Design a protein with these regions (language model features):
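Transmembrane alpha-helices of multi-pass small-molecule transport proteins
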Residues: 1-41, 68, 123-127, 144-162, ...
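Alpha-helical transmembrane segments of compact multi-pass small-molecule transporters, enriched
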Residues: 2-7, 61-75, 90-91, 149-153, ...
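Hydrophobic transmembrane alpha-helices of multi-pass small-molecule transport proteins
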Residues: 8, 72, 81-103, 120-121, ...
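Specific transmembrane alpha-helical segments of multi-pass solute transporters/efflux pumps
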Residues: 13-56, 62, 98, 180-198
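Juxtamembrane helix-entry segments on the extracytoplasmic side of multipass membrane proteins
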Residues: 23-28, 101-123, 159-178, 225-234
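Hydrophobic/small/kink-forming positions within alpha-helical transmembrane segments
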Residues: 36, 40, 44, 67-71, ...
Length: 250
């Protein structure tokens, strides 16, 4: 997160001809901090879960967050849950439960990883819901302040984890810089900027590239080959997530 800040400053200087990030409403700072707390919790649980469960399980389960966005929107903002959402909810979690069951994670002690992913999906849903309420704010301002507060909140899990907090090799530094540039600066900024400018189906299909890409790369890099039944339930889950995102963006 910290390494992404210089890129954001440079982009702000390029687009707005200034270094200062000026918000339209003072409440934006508070909501950015709240969103950052949820996002930091999501990332902490998600990264920890990948040491326990598979990359494909972790990514697909965490991407069920639109379901939590809709449920939380109903609870806190009385946003109606449509019949199509209920269908997407059922399809998504039939797929997820099937994926977990046929991964045999409940037998080999990896079920905890899948449970952590579900909790992470909830917190990512909180993050998305809060960010959605900042729709009138400039997307670059939102990303800057959420990134800044994530830096602060990340100190807590970092201190708990302990160990060497500074990268010890140029390879580790390169990985961190690429993550900062590609994931936080590039990914989060363009998602926030583009999500309201393209159609709901287009946004849903685009965001589904994350779990699909992660599953393919996990098979290539980590030899996490899915069985036929796992692939079937993964596709069912992705279809449910696709429907949920269409419902969420309408």
């Amino acid at each position: 997160m910290l390494l992404a800040l210089p890129f954001l400053f440079l982009l702000n200087l390029r687009l707005n001809k200034k270094l200062k990030f000026t918000v339209n409403d003072s409440k934006t700072i508070f909501f950015a901090a709240l969103a950052s707390l949820a996002f930091t919790t999501d990332l902490t649980l998600w990264h920890y879960s990948m040491n326990i469960t598979s990359v494909s399980n972790a990514t697909i389960i965490v991407n069920s967050s639109p379901v939590f966005v809709a449920i939380l929107g109903y609870i806190f903002f009385r946003e109606k849950l449509s019949r199509s959402f209920v269908v997407s909810f059922l399809i998504t979690y039939i797929g997820i439960l099937g994926l977990i069951y046929f991964s045999n994670n409940y037998l080999n002690g990896k079920l905890l990883g899948d449970i952590l992913c579900l909790i992470a999906a909830f917190f990512y849903g909180v993050y998305l819901l809060v960010i959605a309420k900042l729709g009138k704010e400039n997307s670059l301002n939102i990303i800057f302040y959420t990134t800044f507060f994530c830096c602060l909140f990340s100190i807590i899990p970092m201190m708990i984890e302990g160990g060497n907090l500074i990268p010890s090799s140029s390879f580790e530094w390169l990985n961190l810089i690429l993550m900062a540039f590609l994931c936080q600066f590039g990914g989060q900024y363009f998602i926030t900027h583009a999500i309201g400018k393209i159609s709901a189906p287009g946004a849903s299909i685009g965001l589904l590239m994350q779990p699909l890409t992660a599953t393919i790369l996990a098979a290539i890099i980590f030899s996490e080959i899915l069985t036929t039944l796992q692939i079937v339930f993964a596709l069912i889950s992705l279809f449910g997530i696709y429907l949920a995102r269409i419902n969420l963006n309408q």
